[in-house]
C-alpha cells in the first residue's frame, strides 16, 4: 500500500501475509481462545524461561502451555507457519530462507514439565490436538481436572492462567 501526504510518500510491503500472532500450531480452539502473542507476553513478564515446572490450571485449548514450551526450548514462534508473503517476492532467496528457518542451533533442552488442566473434556481434546501439532507432547502434560482439585506442587513451579470470565462461566463450571 502507499500513502501520500503533502510532499511525503510512504510505501509499505506486506512481508508476513497472515497476521503474525497466528503462530500456525493452533488446529482448533475453544470459545474465545487466548491470543498467542498475549500468552507469550504473560509468560515473559514473569521472567520464566523454563527453570522450573509451569502450570496452567485452566488451559482451554492449550495456548499458554504451548507458548511456555516454545519459550523454554527457545523455539522461534513463527516456525509453524506454512508461508510468509515475502516468499512470493521476486528477490526471495529460498536457500537462505531454508538455512535460517531450519537453524535450530539456539534451541535448548527443557528438563522440567508444563502441566495444563481443564475441567472440559472437549477443551482437553482440543489442547491435546494443538500440542501434538506443535510437536510438544514430550514437554506438556494435559489432564482433565476441575480447578477445585488443583493441589499445590511440592517442587518450585510457576502458575500462569487465563481464567474464563463473563458469560462464558458460572460458579458451577469451575
Regions found by a protein language model. Name each.
Residues 1-25:
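Non-catalytic substrate-recognition/targeting regions of SAM-dependent transferases
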Residues 24-34:
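Class I SAM-dependent methyltransferase Rossmann-like catalytic core
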Residues 56, 162-163:
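Hydrophobic alpha-helix-in-membranes signature
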Residues 19, 165-168:
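A short, flexible beta-alpha/helix-coil linker loop
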Residues 170-174:
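Glycine-rich S-adenosyl-L-methionine
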Residues 68, 163-166:
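Proline/glycine-anchored alpha-helix kink/cap motifs
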Residues 34-151:
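Conserved S-adenosyl-L-methionine
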Residues 148-160:
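A short acidic, Gly/Pro-enriched loop at the edge of an enzyme's catalytic core
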Amino acid at each position: 500500500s502507499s500513502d501520500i501526504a503533502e510532499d511525503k510518500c510512504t510505501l509499505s510491503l506486506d512481508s508476513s501475509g497472515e497476521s503474525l500472532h497466528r503462530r500456525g500450531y493452533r488446529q482448533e480452539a475453544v470459545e474465545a481462545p487466548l491470543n498467542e502473542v498475549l500468552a507469550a507476553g504473560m509468560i515473559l513478564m514473569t521472567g520464566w524461561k523454563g527453570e522450573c515446572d509451569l502450570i496452567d490450571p485452566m488451559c482451554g485449548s492449550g495456548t499458554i502451555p504451548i507458548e511456555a514450551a516454545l519459550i523454554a526450548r527457545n523455539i522461534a514462534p513463527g516456525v509453524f507457519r506454512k508461508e510468509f508473503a515475502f516468499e512470493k517476492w521476486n528477490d526471495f532467496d529460498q536457500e537462505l530462507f531454508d538455512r535460517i528457518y531450519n537453524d535450530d542451533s539456539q534451541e535448548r533442552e527443557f528438563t522440567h514439565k508444563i502441566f495444563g488442566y481443564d475441567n472440559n473434556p472437549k477443551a482437553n481434546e482440543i489442547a491435546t490436538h494443538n500440542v501434538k501439532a506443535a510437536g510438544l507432547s514430550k514437554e506438556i502434560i494435559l489432564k482433565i481436572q476441575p480447578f477445585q482439585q488443583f493441589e499445590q506442587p511440592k517442587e518450585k513451579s510457576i502458575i500462569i492462567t487465563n481464567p474464563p470470565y463473563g458469560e462464558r462461566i458460572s460458579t458451577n463450571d469451575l
